[in-house]
Amino acid sequence: MVASAAGALPIKAIDTVSVLSVLREIEAAGVLHTAHQALTTARMIFDFAISIGVLQFNPADRLHKALPRRPKAQHHPALAIDQVGPMLRTLEASGSSPVTKAAIRLALLLGLRDTSLRTLTWGDVDLAGAQLTVRAANMKGRREFSTPLPKQAIAVLKELHALTFRGPDSYLFPGSGKNARVSPSTLGDALKRTGHTVTTHGMRSLLNTYLAECGFRLEAREAQLAHVHGDQTDQAYMRSNFWPHRVEMMQHWGDVVTALEAGKPVPRVEVDKVRRIRAA
């Protein structure tokens, strides 16, 4: 432990009361999550000390019962499928900028994470190849990710190109400052103005749920959402082997979004096509 007087004590002199005292200090500062993290770290340190014969017992054992429980994690509000049309129509009629509207549309059409979306540059976009690539540095798993572009996303990008293209290194969604990109709050505020409690992450949840209900295979959905499984070889296999499946899958999703915004019947999944994709 590094706080309070316990930080200066030899490890053999630290007892349960000393550890609890430090945890109470952290809890009193209003950072309960940090207190739980500190307890976990302390237990690991003391366990190591036991393993090398320095200590006989762990003074941090069972202290988790002395701390209040962590609050339950707040899940990102998911968008229901029947809210997509009203949300998009309200967004289009709102006072949000065309660039912000385009960002939200692409988030819905592609299921990209917030950071991956906001850090995109025009050098990441291949309109002719109907493909968009997110650099490894901008991905949660630090691995480069590519997504097929349905025709709806290509249409959004072509309109956006006229507004924000300043070269391959320029951001798709620039912010107000020099070399800045759009902020998370800008997208969040625009979504709030639609009257729907939803985040870009909630759009990812909708995409996954809906495509699962349509019968598209798990591997294709996991690859599209860039969920990390296995080593780099496994990831390369997932990206390459399921690319044709993802092209079909994401075009179907784009057609669904178009129909919902227009208030028209949602296109049915071609059962035979899905079966072929699942069997491949």
Per-range role (PLM):
Residues 80-85, 129, 138, 148-201, ...:
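Active-site/catalytic core of tyrosine-dependent DNA strand-transfer enzymes
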